[in-house]
Amino acid sequence: MNILSGRFKGQKIRTIKKARYRPTTSRVRKSIFDMLGDLDEYSVLDLFAGSGILGFEAASRGAAAITFVDNNGRNVKLIHVNSKIFQDQVDMKVVCKDWCHYLQMQHEYDIIFADPPYGKIDIAKLVEKCLTTLLNNGRFVLETSSRESIPVGGCSKKFGDSMITIWTKTV
């Protein structure tokens, strides 16, 4: 898997063979980042990070700080390995923790990406917690199965079996 754009365009991101995560496809990633636009100096949270590709793509496109959260130790180790590509040019933190416990720590972000396992997470609870964690005008990007019920208020786009929904926090 490669970074699509930005200062690290083309950089290969290693993945785990027979991984339990489902990496966001390049087509979906391109669409997400086209919708988000400029990320200069943003703080980003990549929940259910898997390979970390969404966070790495954000770093390549100018984000200043990325926090990766995943509860799988193998994924966390892989993200640490892949983060060496950035050689301290971006502030990166990798956390091995359950998403719900992490969000209780009261950090705030400009952008939150979440790509939870399809059909295994209470999506309404996830959306509620992520929206409270965003800074004003922050955006929450959620990838789900297109068959899942999504809370209202976001802008959705379908990609085969996947759906991307983006919410913007306004006061």
Describe these PLM feature segments:
Residues 1-171:
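Class I S-adenosyl-L-methionine-dependent methyltransferase catalytic core
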